[in-house]
Amino acid sequence: MPQSCPNLNESRHYADLLSLPFTDLRRLLTAARVSAAEVPMAAGLHYNYAAMPVEERHLDLLQGLSDEFDLVGQYQRLLAGERMNVGENRRVLHHLTRGQLGPAVMHDGRDLGAFYREQHQRIFAFAEQVHRGALRGSSGAAFTQVCQIGIGGSDLGPRALYLALQQEARRQGCQLMTAEFLSNVDPDDADQVLARLDLARTLFVLVSKSGTTQETLTNETLVRVALRHQGLDDRAHLVAVTSETSPLAGNSAYRDSFYMDDFVGGRFSSTSAVGAVVLSLAFGPAIFQALLAGAHAQDALALQPDIRHNASLLDALLGVYLRNVLGYPCSAVLPYSQALSRFPAHLQQLDMESNGKSVNRRGEPLPYASGPIIFGEPGTNGQHSFYQLLHQGTDVVPLQFIGFEQAQGQRDLLVQGSTSQDKLNANLAAQLVAFAKGRADENANRHFAGQRPASLIRGARLTAEALGALLAHFENKIMFQGFVWNINSFDQEGVQLGKVLTGQLLAGTAEDEALQAYGRLLGLRPPA
């Protein structure tokens, strides 16, 4: 059972890792290593760890740690439906939304894999009706835009995936609807999003598993008022993605409802109905199905016990080594692909909400560090922003690069002897070597110490399958790290206290004087 799993500091392999001498990246990084230190992933991707400060002796100990903690076995139990979310006594079934890898998971007599597949098929049929004009807005106009209303996992993942797939869909001629996303309760966000929409031709997708999310329901009201102001029937322009037990389920205020359940956490929900509706409407079911196929294939590879053949497991263990042996508190995600512009923000939530924990699965304080701080931006933009600190700052920040040989689009020209894609990838290669090897200079201001660890996920082109594999890779990496740290990666109690205090302020029941004072300072109005 997860509750009986040991802490990291109890591991003999971890103790041996702590005793290993420092590895000089400047010596280690050679052309032969760049070619050899690589693990295949799904959809033609590869995980390259040549610029990581580890040698065979490190990998042997990390393999021992994986075996000692039965990391793949814990993953198998999760797939079989064991209640790995020990804090909420729930199963963890996001893998099942893209395919079956273990036995059938039953709940109250229902096959949950079949339930997720049924919801996908309902969504695909609905999207097809919208695309052929069988379902229209209340004015009779065909829907040409879709807007997802949601926050957190109901926004970050689907938004990142939409942006990542948009150029690929255009290349294939299947950008069927444009999408917008409304998340923040800041009224200016709603104003700006609504100003970009033709409301008569817009279908809104309200996403709230509980049906009670404050920010989402507030924005829903703003949308309904805007629709009515234009003489439109708001009920014809909204569908809901929710749980079957929420107040939104089967509600006549929505044109239709599509379902998820409590076993799929918000930040892991992009391959459930949460992502399926908006992506199938925008690009058609085939693109979303390709995304699912890539994710499922990567999930299957994550069952490989040998870390030298399991990129997600190796990436997880290298991250633990960087965090708990070398003591690095941050990690930067740096995609050299503008299509992945919002992918770091999604990974920030995925990682920090999952592994930002300070107690183990028994509720005991952790005697070691857990999840790192995650941030990032696409290259080459980041090079002209925060890379200065990454190269010469006093803190070492490990780096996760992502790059592709080809652009998604076809429009690229030779400029000064090279294409834009050539320039992009030349910058990526240069950064990998610069971070690892540095440069000696008598002028201290121009001296680069190097020794900055980095990994690279590379592929031919960012396709829907590759994006699915990339998504699943990071989800599984984070899962494995949670197992190593003996924490529950599948709850988020840290976000609850702020919600409680917000509710007190808005209801006028706050008793804390400092809370009341901040409310007054920010011009909070007394409850109506």
Question: What does each model-identified segment do?
Answer:
Residues 144-152, 204-210, 330-337, 373-374, ...:
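Short glycine-rich or small-residue beta-strand-to-loop segments that form or flank ligand, phosphate
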Residues 4-139, 144, 417-428, 435-437, ...:
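Extended, charge-enriched "interface" segments that sit outside catalytic cores
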Residues 161-166, 195-199, 221-223, 255, ...:
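Short, solvent-exposed amphipathic alpha-helical segments in soluble enzyme
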Residues 226-411, 450, 497-501, 506-528:
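Active-site phosphate/pyrophosphate-binding segments
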Residues 391-394, 402-461:
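Substrate-recognition/cap regions that form aromatic- and gly/pro-loop-enriched pockets
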Residues 13, 21, 54-61, 74, ...:
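General structural feature for long, well-ordered alpha-helical segments within catalytic domains
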Residues 455-527:
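C-terminal helical/tail subdomains of lipid-metabolizing enzymes
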Residues 124-133, 139-306, 504-507:
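Glycine-rich phosphate-binding loops that contact phosphosugars or nucleotide phosphates
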